[in-house]
Amino acid sequence: MVTTYIKSDLQLDGRQFFQPKDNLKMAELFMECEEEELEPWQKKVKEVEEDDDDEPIFVAEIASSKPAISNILNRVNPSSHSRGIKNGILNRGFTASFKPTSQRCLNSASNPVAALPVNFHPESRSSDSSVIVQPFSKPGYVTNSPRVLSNNSSELLFDLTQDTGLSHYQGGPTLSIAGLNETSFLSKRPSGSDISSVNPKKPKPSENTSGIDASSVISSEKSPSVISLQVVPSQGANCSSSQSKNGTTFPRACPKCDIHFNLLDPLKNHMTYCCPDMINNFLGLTKADNLNSANEAKTLESEKGKLIMLVNDFYYGKHEGDVLEEQKTHTTFKCFSCLKVLKNNIRFMNHMKHHLELEKQSSESWEKHTTCQHCYRQFPTPFQLQCHIESTHTPHEFSTICKICELSFETEQILLQHMKDNHKPGEMPYICQVCNYRSSLFSEVESHFRTSHENTKNLLCPFCLKVIKIATPYMHHYMKHQKKGIHRCTKCRLQFLTCKEKMDHKTQHHRTFVKPKQLEGLPPGTKVTIRASVGPLQSGSSVTPSISPSTSTLQLSPPEPDNVTAKNHVKLTTSTPNTTISDPSKANETKSNGSKSKNKSKVSNMQKKQSTLSSSNKKSKVNTALRNLRLRRGVHECIECSSEVKDFANHFPTYVHCSFCRYNTSCSKAYVNHMMSFHSNRPSKRYCIFKKHSENLRGISLVCLNCDFLTDVSGLDNMATHLSQHETHSCRVLVEQVSVCIPTSERLSEIKTEAPTKGQEPVSKETARHSRAEGEPGASHSGSKQDKVPSSEEGTGCDASVCEAAAATHCEKDVTVSDTENVSSSKNILSHDPDVGTDTMEKEEKTHHACQEMELKVDQSSESTNPTEAELSSETRQGLQLTSGDVGIDQFLRQGDEPKSVNSDASDPGSVRLEPLTPSEVLEYEATEILHDGDDPSANTSDTVSDQTGGSPGGSNPCRAETAVDLADGEERS
């Protein structure tokens, strides 16, 4: 809420003009205007001949020999009409209060008058002065064209507008204080407290008359709807021009969709989206009118020692530079990247920009979603980037945008503070290095280069405005700007490759280049008021929240204490933080310092409340359907991110599309995981969204039945691509129960090193035969021939090959094995496989236990027999030939290189091979194995028999016993 007090001392030759009966020495006129609603209906100040006021809010007419400069007042809420009035009687002074009802009152402190209308005629020789308060029979009618009652009267007529209607007063030529027409709501927005007064020509002295010292106060910038009153001379029928040139009254309709609006602000906001090309013509706004009204305001204010300037005139400007006729060369440029030849420099620059966009799209970088394509700034999130583009890089000009930085701010007050802290008057940081053309706007320099330096050798860098004349260095320079080591200027949009270039740019170019013309020739000490715009504030930049409908109450009250005046004066100064506003009373200015901090805190609190209200309204509009959604009781889990959904409106804020692929989602977490997992440059830091369910996918592999192509779960897309390329091929899914403790990479290496699919059936046949041979003569032969065991290397290799063959038969579900015992034993092996390899503590315990057992057996044995290596090798080969049948030796030995499938018994030599042992430990186990096999063959035989019959899982490996039986058969036959 912005409150303005206007103090007007009316005196002539030391005598008072209005002198009440309570013998006050001076009648002081205080006008309090409270603004509660944003309504941009303020119009351009014109003389009566050109006045086109469609909605006159306040009209006053004063007859005088010379016109006085006008006042600009604010509209107020009718809820404040009772202030200073008690039981229909004013407290003191000379007060007129307007109400939206039919009752109106005008009286002095001692003589209240209840009848309406009331004419107050002070005694005067030269002219009669009357004050008329116009009654309203209904609150919804408006007086559009007031006329005076007599030719020689001086009237002050107050007129309130709420709706449409007409009421007339007839009279002759007078002076008119006319409200602004609707064409000036964009061309003039008074923001500071600007005081200007003109002393009219003094008439002859009389008893109760005095001259008029008209003091005008321009309303605060933070008042969204402003009424401008101008005292202008009017003669004859000119006083009724506001009625004849009013045009259509509200409600108005959109010219495109014919939707009716009662207020101008909603209509303007609607037209910006519906028909932005028709808004200027529809509202009758031209650039010339804007400049004329701004120049008139500056001229009037400069007469009183104060200058009011706009941000565009004070900070922005351009310099034409050197006027040189550059020779057109029509040089062609070749792109070394795509080898395309461009006809001129402008086309080559466009081609490089196109290359940059393609590179960003193909790089799958997260920066593409957060970098502005207009000013190349980076933002934390794509949402902030979208907000920046919509608020800054738009065809519509907003009064909260810094055109130098190309940034948008929340309010005009924040913009003014930013301009004061970062920029200088007449600052032009963007320079054309060819002709020294300068401007405060980057777009002007770029368009100047494209028009003035076309068909030349010059190539302009859009990042730092550097000019290069050769294509290859220009491309290298252009691509260097894409690296992360660039240096951005904090006061404009340029970015440089070195820190020195950035510092030179800041010191040389971010300062006043050309002093504004309005500041030339001003006397020292002139106070300059800077405003963001002359039109009304945008709907989102008002300081006070819109609570009540736009109605106006004007209250004339006697002087109040100084502290109240000081507080209201501070409210004016806070609207323009970089301006010092003069006040007629020095005492009020000194006393206002104490209350300045309090009022600033109030303004900030109101801004916070308004922002929270607007944000909550936006959120409620977006999530209306989700907030009203009825759900069942219990825990709801998101199927995309596997997290609990507590608030559906917050968990699913909006529907987003991935720009790289066809992924669409409403879950914000799932979108972030998708972008980081599939479109990030760092695969090591990818987020796995299926972390909880990843163990279920392990052990699944896909194999092509027509070729050797094999892949795991992570290569499903590769298998799909393979099958699409080979239409005759088909694949099979192999599922294996894999424990969580086995790492995935170990299993993948095991699958990928297996034999091709074509060779799997012979291997399974060999395994089946091998298992049958295992059950028939195994127990009888192993008792007597167990002392001839081959060396640890060959024996272990044979065991591993046979066990791996058995494991392969279990992994493939399509291969059937006739021997049920062998299948059960292979499952037993696979079930114990995971318990061996990963748990370090179990390894150490089992290894320590095995060492103790072997040491005890070595102590008990007294003799050991070691057959020669040649005999063992020949016996082993014979045994392998018998067991392998028709399987080739190359194919069989190839399986020996595969990872071993071992039992959980750590005392078995086969399982020891997989443990991470040092060479010394390996030698120790080999020695103890030989001693153990030679000394106690009966123990191994019993273990073998127990394993073959499906004994306890703690026994020896059946593959080991199987190999021992085959070796024994080979010895007998030899």
From Swiss-Prot:
Pfam families listed in its UniProt record: DUF4195, zf-C2H2_Z280C_D, zf-POGZ
Annotated Basic and acidic residues bias: 763-775, 830-860
Molecular functions (GO terms): DNA binding; zinc ion binding
Zinc finger (C2H2-type): 333-355, 370-393, 400-424, 430-453, 459-481
Ranges of compositional bias, category Low complexity: 539-557, 591-611
Residue ranges of the region described as Disordered: 188-216, 507-624, 751-797, 815-974
Main location per the UniProt record: nucleus
Modified residues (Phosphoserine): 557, 904, 907
Gene Ontology CC terms, in alphabetical order: nucleus
Cross-link (Glycyl lysine isopeptide (Lys-Gly) (interchain with G-Cter in SUMO2)): 44, 46, 86, 99, 138, 201, 222, 245, 287, 304, 752
Gene responsible for this protein: Znf280d
Compartments, as annotated in UniProt: Nucleus
Biased composition (Polar residues): 571-587, 612-624, 817-829, 861-884, 938-950
Keyword entries, A-Z: DNA-binding, Isopeptide bond, Metal-binding, Nucleus, Phosphoprotein, Repeat, Transcription, Transcription regulation, Ubl conjugation, Zinc, Zinc-finger
Taxon lineage: Eukaryota, Metazoa, Chordata, Craniata, Vertebrata
Species assigned in the record: Mus musculus
Record function comment: May function as a transcription factor.
Domain of life: Eukaryota
Protein name (Swiss-Prot/TrEMBL): Zinc finger protein 280D
